[in-house]
A protein has these predicted regions:
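A residue-level marker of the well-folded mature domains of exported/periplasmic proteins
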Residues: 1-355
């Protein structure tokens, strides 16, 4: 991947079929909607705020007439389908979707496309041919998280795995990628696997229920989606030493890590960025304004946080948020160019202020 803040350059030949609009004049009277399938963790809550902030900025600039946001609380596909069906009756020109299922929403998405509505699915994807997808680089996130935790454990010891939001498009590939890494460490024994549903409260309860029956845990590999501090809380409430826990880039987790560094605590933190919602918004606006050649499937880079950068990220990440970066239209277009041209994905710089 490119270094943070760099922009890949491409030749005209590499970008010959890509055409991005220079204005948003075509969408001044349009209403854009966002359908989100889950609100139970800081990642999704940060994502909702990110998308809304960009929509409000676009509305203030005269790029859109208005926007709508509909949320389902518990990742229920049937409820999300009903909400999208209601949007189809309101005259929206585009719908951005964070999907409850890789397949269950396909019918209603195809219905939207048949009505001429532009559909961009991001973070947790669906699988129709008509949608545009902006996903997270799951192999990189999961592989680096598992690799980092295995190395912290010295390649041996007892591990607990905390799975994420089971049923979404990203969870099973993430879990499988972690298991693939662990195959290279035969002296690491997975002694417990629990489901945290990417929720701090659910992860805390699930881990707390297992701790009395477990041997010493030398590392906890989480899903990195809003559950890590639930694991930490379970150990703290049990008055047990917190082992290395793969953190999820939440402000609360970064504060915990920063405060624990003087005592020698080590961990790994890399995660998808909820700011992908801002890139999805601007991609949608590009499409509505006549963009040509945007790939149907694109990826956004994760945010790795290290001991060298934690103080910077902690300073701009409120406790209730996830470390993220708000993409501008120009930066979204750079991301589109990188995906189109096959170059490295540009990592966002550390923001200078909280989103």
């Amino acid at each position: 991947m490119a270094s943070p803040g760099t922009t890949p350059s491409f030749s005209p030949a590499q970008l010959a079929g890509l055409s991005l609009p220079s204005s948003c004049s075509k969408t001044a009277n349009d209403v854009i909607a966002f359908s989100n399938s889950y609100t139970g963790n800081a990642f999704r809550q940060t994502m909702i705020k990110t998308w809304q902030d960009e929509a409000e900025a676009a509305q203030a600039a005269g790029c859109i007439k208005g926007y709508k946001i509909l949320n389902t609380a518990e990742n229920t596909a049937t409820e999300q389908i009903a909400q999208i069906q209601s949007l189809l009756l309101t005259g929206v020109k585009a719908i951005d979707i964070d999907s409850a299922s890789p397949t269950a929403l396909n019918g209603v998405i195809e219905q939207a496309c048949s009505q001429g509505i532009t559909v961009v699915v991001f973070d947790s994807l669906a699988s129709t041919k008509c949608e545009y997808d902006l996903g997270d680089d799951i192999p990189v996130i999961s592989t680096e998280m598992a690799q980092g935790m295995a190395q912290l454990m010295g390649g041996q010891g007892n591990m607990m795995i905390v799975r994420g939001l089971v049923g979404t498009e990203t969870e099973l590939p993430k879990y499988q990628a972690q298991l693939d890494v662990l195959k290279n460490y035969p002296n690491i024994k997975v002694v417990a696997t629990v489901t945290g549903q990417s929720s701090e409260a659910i992860a805390e309860s699930a881990v707390a229920a297992e701790l009395p029956s477990l041997p010493q845990i030398d590392g906890v590999l989480t899903a990195g989606g809003g559950d890590s501090m639930g694991v930490v809380a379970a150990y703290q409430n049990a008055h047990m030493t917190v082992p290395p826990v793969a953190l999820d880039n939440s402000g609360q987790a970064l504060q915990f890590w920063s405060q624990s560094i003087p005592s020698g605590y080590k961990t790994v933190s890399i995660g998808a960025q909820p700011g992908v919602a801002s890139a999805a918004f601007w991609e949608t606006l590009d499409l509505l304004n006549g963009a040509k050649g945007i790939p149907k499937l694109m990826q956004a880079p994760p945010i790795p946080i290290t001991p060298d950068s934690i103080s910077q990220w902690e300073a701009v990440t409120p406790a209730s948020n996830i470390a993220t970066y708000l993409y501008t239209l120009a930066e979204t277009n750079q991301l589109i160019q990188a995906n189109y041209g096959g170059g490295p994905l540009p990592l966002p710089p550390v923001p200078t202020s909280a989103p």
